[in-house]
């Protein structure tokens, strides 16, 4: 019964094995089908991509052709125009025309780009897809062959396993059979042994012999079966071992195929497919991205051109395009009739009165017209600003129209929301047209009025020159007078700064706001010092100075002092330059903000230097005003310094290397090495094109760097530091007023509107009531308005209660001038005034050498905060060479005569010991000018004229009068010096006011040089400024100090007029100029 079940079991085993092998065989076939299907799908996908790009290339080609047609259509119209010829020549076009050409160029550029894109699709991308398809098919075939080989090997392994398994079954069955036979033999042996245990005596001999032989047979059979069993058992063990080994090998082969070989087969099919497809699609992306880059570059060019839509430059280009039409014609010359040789307006006695009357009428008429025209101008400018606000409304953002979302509701027409469809457009257009009509009406009115003013002003100026008036009285006008110069501070002992902001390692904007210094003193002073002594210094800013000296200068500035104020200071130029660099390098926020670094560096990509400068200007205009003013001042100085590169070896590039890391440090996140070259290029561009980049004084009110500086010029700016009067008030503990009555507040009424130029000056409206404390100078009061203390300009107010003689109206001075004969001669042009700080001209030094006499010593002027004492006329009597044209002699005759006749022992002198400047002049200084009495310089016309006899004065008489006047003044100076016992530190305000009252008058009496002098009912003394040249051969003159005007850049001091050619002089040697006088110690430090 056991055998059939055993065979059945063997069959089940074989059937199960065969079933498993069959499943593997079917799986191998399915794998091959899947690989084949995958390859077909790839080929189909690649075919679709080819068709897609082929169609897209056709579309791009068609689009390119249409764009080319569009551009050609409009380019054909412009090729024959003058604009196109100008564009081809130098590309200097009007900005709108430039935008138009750039639009057409952009269309042509896009046309070329799309044609290039189509070519890339056809000849590059599609070819790549075709190659990928061929490669995929070939790889599948190769992989299929390898797969068949692997399948055969796998089936051989399975067949071998089947054979080994059957062998194992067979030997195992034989072993079992032999074992059962052996067991049966053992049982028979046991039975036989059991029988042999019976008593032998009962068994017959024959039976006993028969049993013995049967036992032997059983033993032999057992031995035989034992041997058979052992043999079969060994075979079975060997067969089983072989089967197990083969089974393990088969399982390993199957596992390897499914885990490794199959993956390798798939990799063979995919070999290069994804990489090739990646390259093909990246070719497409590169083409599209480069198309967009090219488009963006073109749009950036157009955007830059749109940003440069500027009417001023277009106006200039337009006028340059038609020079013949817009060039001013030649002036009309005087055409003499029948030999008439007179070509000037005659002011002789018969017509003098008529010309005087006409001059007065023109003066009055001009004043009225200017006020009216100024109001019309303000209205015009306000209307223009309104129109500009209307036309510059930012309504061009259409980003909402391009917002994408999954919802189709957002993809709707936005035409209803555009600017042109808004309901308010009609009303806006109507308002704009109405405003434009009003603007043109006011503009026509303003132009007509300004034309009339121009004609009347020309006549007025000609009459003024003819009649010989140097300074007309301002009482004739009804418009606000020029703003007087600010009272400047004392430089003798600069007190410690009152601001709390750090100078070094601080914030520039905060420091300017806190200190009131528009240009920090350290910047202004260092630049001035280098301007005077270091422009030709080789290697300036590149060669390091003494660290000890740099620290000393730095500490002095931090204490609020100015160590460079003394012109005789022998600081090393390199140390001063090092302090300037140290200041900018230590700023908490660099001069160029870090947030603007990337924007500025991006300007390097602009090759055109002018366009680059304009782009930099656009970026810098976003900076704070205070920083921009300092930046403008610094780069104007660096540009000036680079003009001496032949001597100092510092061209703009070298200066940029020195100042680049200081002014524009590279952020830490940037590459320091690569960015530094770009930074230097930016700084170099700003140095070279600083006039283009920075707004001028008209656009940005503030100090402007002057190339020609003198020892005291750098404080001439009306933007000097505030709080100077407080420093004067604190100096020596003196009171800045001239009488005890001024201690009581005085009420005043504003005649005109005034807007303060700084926080120190008060702003007020016409008719406002002001409270005046005391007189700070001839031009300024210390007062209060609306609870705020500050400076009040004298010429803008009417004083209700004034007992002080200095504070009285200047009409008293005019009366005294009209009644004083000895001083009327001195009303000459202010251009002839001699500066006490002038150096000796070459002519004078040459004459001294010819005489064999040493020239008078040249004294460097002391420091003041402004180059002249604003509280003291610049004709200080400490200069013993009295100039007949000095305003002091013409403007203050009463004070001069009173001073001359004043008893030195009078109560007035005792009450004011040492306050007059005369007591502060040393005898040695006073005696310096006795050697060479000078001849007074001529007026601007070149000769002395008297309107009484119309004859030129004798030069010898003039020299004799000058000598007598000089000797008299010197004698009085010596007497006053001997009698003066009190010495005190000079006070700017008090000394100035005392000198105005106590100035001596010359002894000579001559006729007035100007008939207009007797006409003026009120003469305001001209505000003058002193300019001291740093070179020995440069002469400076006094010139009227006018209020700073927007757009008017400060210029170097004008040279004196040439001296008149007087009789009895060598034609090769000019007349001796007045010798150098000692410094006016009432205004110097």
From Swiss-Prot:
Residues 743-802 form the SH3 domain. Residues 351-390, 956-985 form a coiled coil. Residues 922-931 have a biased composition (Basic and acidic residues). CDD domains: F-BAR_srGAP1, RhoGAP_srGAP, SH3_srGAP1-3. The modification Phosphoserine is found at residues 416, 835, 917, 932, 999, 1032. Signal peptide: none annotated. It comes from the Eukaryota. Keywords: Coiled coil, Disease variant, GTPase activation, Phosphoprotein, SH3 domain. InterPro entries: AH/BAR_dom_sf, F_BAR, FCH_dom, Rho_GTPase_activation_prot, RhoGAP_dom, SH3-like_dom_sf, SH3_domain, SLIT-ROBO_RhoGAP. SUPFAM superfamilies: BAR/IMD domain-like (SSF103657), GTPase activation domain, GAP (SSF48350), SH3-domain (SSF50044). PROSITE patterns: F_BAR, RHOGAP, SH3. Residues 808-822, 937-946, 997-1011 have a biased composition (Polar residues). The record marks 542 as: Arginine finger. One of its GO terms (molecular function) is small GTPase binding. Expressed in brain, lung, kidney, and testis. Residues 475-496, 808-954, 997-1038, 1051-1085 are annotated as: Disordered. The modification Phosphothreonine is found at residue 1001. GO terms for cellular component: cytoplasm; cytosol. GO terms for biological process: cell migration; negative regulation of cell migration; Rho protein signal transduction. GTPase-activating protein for RhoA and Cdc42 small GTPases. Together with CDC42 seems to be involved in the pathway mediating the repulsive signaling of Robo and Slit proteins in neuronal migration. SLIT2, probably through interaction with ROBO1, increases the interaction of SRGAP1 with ROBO1 and inactivates CDC42. The F-BAR domain mediates oligomerization, binds membranes, and constrains plasma membrane protrusions. Homodimer. Forms a heterooligomer with SRGAP2 and SRGAP3 through its F-BAR domain. Interacts with ROBO1, CDC42 and RHOA. Interacts with FASLG. It is linked to Thyroid cancer, non-medullary, 2: A form of non-medullary thyroid cancer (NMTC), a cancer characterized by tumors originating from the thyroid follicular cells. NMTCs represent approximately 95% of all cases of thyroid cancer and are classified into papillary, follicular, Hurthle cell, and anaplastic neoplasms. This is SLIT-ROBO Rho GTPase-activating protein 1. It comes from Homo sapiens (Human). The lineage of its organism: Eukaryota, Metazoa, Chordata, Craniata, Vertebrata. The gene is SRGAP1.
């Amino acid at each position: 019964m056991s055998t059939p079940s055993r065979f059945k079991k063997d069959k089940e085993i074989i059937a199960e094995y065969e079933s498993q092998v069959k499943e593997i065989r079917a799986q191998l076939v399915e794998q091959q089908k899947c690989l084949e299907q995958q390859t077909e799908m790839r080929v189909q996908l690649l075919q679709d991509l080819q068709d897609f790009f082929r169609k897209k290339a056709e579309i791009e080609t068609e689009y390119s052709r249409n764009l080319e047609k569009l551009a050609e259509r409009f380019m054909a119209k412009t090729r024959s125009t003058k604009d196109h010829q100008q564009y081809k020549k130098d590309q200097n076009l009007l900005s709108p025309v430039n935008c138009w050409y750039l639009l057409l160029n952009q269309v042509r550029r896009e046309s070329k780009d799309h044609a290039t894109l189509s070519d890339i699709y056809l000849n590059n991308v599609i070819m790549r897809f075709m190659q990928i398809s061929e490669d995929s098919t070939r790889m599948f075939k190769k992989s299929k062959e390898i797969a068949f080989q692997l399948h055969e090997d796998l089936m051989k392994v399975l067949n071998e396993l089947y054979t080994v398994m059957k062998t194992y079954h067979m030997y195992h069955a034989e072993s079992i059979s032999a074992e059962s036979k052996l067991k049966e033999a053992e049982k028979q042996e046991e039975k036989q042994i059991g029988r042999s245990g019976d008593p032998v005596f009962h068994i017959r001999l024959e039976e006993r012999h028969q049993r013995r032989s049967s036992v032997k047979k059983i033993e032999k059979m057992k031995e035989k079966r034992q041997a058979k069993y052992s043999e079969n058992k060994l075979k079975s063990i060997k067969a089983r071992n072989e089967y197990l080994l083969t089974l393990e090998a088969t399982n390993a082969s199957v596992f390897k195929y499914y885990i490794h070989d199959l993956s390798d087969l798939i990799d063979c099919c995919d070999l290069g497919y994804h990489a090739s497809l990646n390259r093909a699609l990246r070719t497409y992306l590169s083409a599209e991205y480069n198309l967009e880059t090219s488009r963006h570059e073109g749009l950036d060019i157009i955007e830059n051109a749109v940003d440069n839509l500027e009417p001023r430059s277009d106006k200039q280009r337009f006028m340059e395009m038609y020079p013949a039409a817009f060039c001013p014609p030649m002036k009309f010359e005087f055409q003499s009739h029948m030999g008439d040789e007179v070509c000037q307006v005659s002011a002789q006695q018969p017509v003098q009165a008529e010309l005087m009357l006409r001059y007065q009428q023109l003066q009055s008429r001009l004043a009225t017209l200017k006020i009216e025209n100024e109001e019309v101008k303000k209205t015009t400018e306000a209307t223009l600003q309104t129109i500009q606000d209307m036309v510059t409304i930012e309504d061009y953002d259409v980003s909402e129209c391009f917002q994408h979302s999954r919802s189709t509701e957002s993809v709707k027409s936005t035409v209803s929301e555009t600017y042109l469809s808004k309901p308010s457009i009609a009303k806006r257009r109507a308002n704009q047209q109405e405003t434009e009509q009003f603007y043109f009406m006011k503009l026509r009115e303003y132009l007509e009025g300004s034309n009339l003013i121009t004609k009347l002003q020309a006549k007025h100026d000609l009459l003024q020159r003819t009649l010989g008036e140097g300074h007309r009285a301002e009482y004739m006008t009804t418009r606000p007078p020029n703003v007087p110069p600010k009272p400047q501070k004392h430089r003798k002992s600069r007190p410690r700064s009152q601001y709390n902001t750090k100078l070094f390692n601080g914030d520039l904007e905060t420091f300017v706001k806190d200190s009131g210094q528009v240009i920090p003193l350290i910047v202004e002073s260092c630049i001035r010092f280098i301007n005077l002594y270091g422009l030709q210094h080789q290697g300036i800013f590149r060669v390091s100075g003494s660290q000890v000296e740099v620290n000393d200068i730095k500490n002095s500035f931090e204490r609020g002092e100015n160590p460079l104020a003394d012109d005789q200071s022998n600081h090393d130029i390199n140390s001063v330059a090092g302090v300037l660099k140290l200041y900018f390098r230590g700023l908490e926020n660099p001069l160029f903000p870090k947030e603007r670094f990337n924007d500025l560096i991006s300007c390097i990509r602009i090759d055109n230097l002018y366009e680059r400068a304009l782009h930099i200007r656009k970026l810098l205009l976003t900076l704070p005003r205070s920083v921009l003013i300092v930046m403008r001042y610094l780069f104007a100085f660096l540009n000036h310094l680079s003009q001496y590169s032949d001597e100092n070896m510092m061209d703009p590039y070298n200066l940029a290397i020195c100042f680049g890391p200081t002014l524009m440090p590279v952020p830490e996140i940037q590459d320091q090495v690569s960015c530094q070259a770009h930074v230097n290029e930016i700084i170099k561009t700003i140095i070279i094109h600083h006039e283009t980049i920075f707004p001028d004084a008209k656009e940005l009110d503030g100090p402007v760097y002057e190339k020609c500086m003198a020892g005291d010029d750098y404080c001439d700016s009306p933007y000097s530091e505030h709080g100077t009067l407080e420093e004067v008030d604190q100096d020596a503990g003196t009171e800045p007023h001239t009488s005890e009555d001024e201690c009581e507040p005085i009420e005043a009424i504003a005649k005109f509107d005034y807007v303060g130029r700084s926080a120190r000056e008060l702003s007020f409206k016409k008719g406002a009531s002001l409270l005046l404390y005391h007189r700070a100078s001839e031009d300024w009061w210390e007062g209060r308005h609306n609870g705020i203390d500050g400076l009040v300009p004298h010429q803008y107010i009417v004083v209700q209660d004034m007992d002080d003689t200095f504070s009285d109206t200047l009409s008293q001075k005019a009366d005294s001038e009209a009644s004083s004969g000895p001083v009327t001669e001195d009303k000459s042009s202010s251009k002839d005034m001699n500066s006490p700080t002038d150096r000796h001209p070459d002519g004078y030094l040459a004459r001294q050498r010819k005489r064999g006499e040493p020239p008078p010593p040249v004294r460097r002027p002391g420091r003041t905060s402004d180059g002249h004492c604003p509280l003291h006329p610049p004709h200080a009597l400490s200069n013993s060479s009295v100039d007949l044209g000095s305003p002091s002699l013409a403007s203050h005759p009463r004070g001069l005569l009173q001073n001359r006749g004043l008893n030195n022992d009078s109560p007035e002198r005792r009450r004011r010991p040492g306050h007059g400047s005369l007591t502060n002049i040393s005898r040695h200084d006073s005696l310096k000018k006795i050697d060479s009495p000078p001849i007074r310089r001529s007026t601007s016309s070149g000769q002395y004229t008297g309107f009484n006899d119309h004859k030129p004065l004798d030069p010898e008489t003039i020299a004799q009068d000058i000598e007598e006047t000089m000797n008299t003044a010197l004698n009085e100076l010596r007497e006053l010096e001997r009698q003066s016992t009190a010495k005190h530190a000079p006070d700017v305000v008090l000394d100035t006011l005392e000198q105005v009252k106590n100035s001596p008058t010359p002894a000579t009496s001559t006729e007035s040089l100007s008939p207009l002098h007797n006409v003026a009912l009120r003469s305001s003394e001209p505000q003058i400024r002193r300019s001291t040249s740093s070179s020995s051969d440069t002469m400076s003159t006094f010139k009227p100090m006018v209020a700073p005007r927007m757009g008017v850049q400060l210029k170097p001091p004008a040279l004196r007029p040439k001296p008149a050619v007087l009789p009895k002089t060598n034609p090769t040697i000019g007349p001796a100029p007045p010798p150098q006088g000692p410094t006016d110690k009432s205004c110097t430090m």
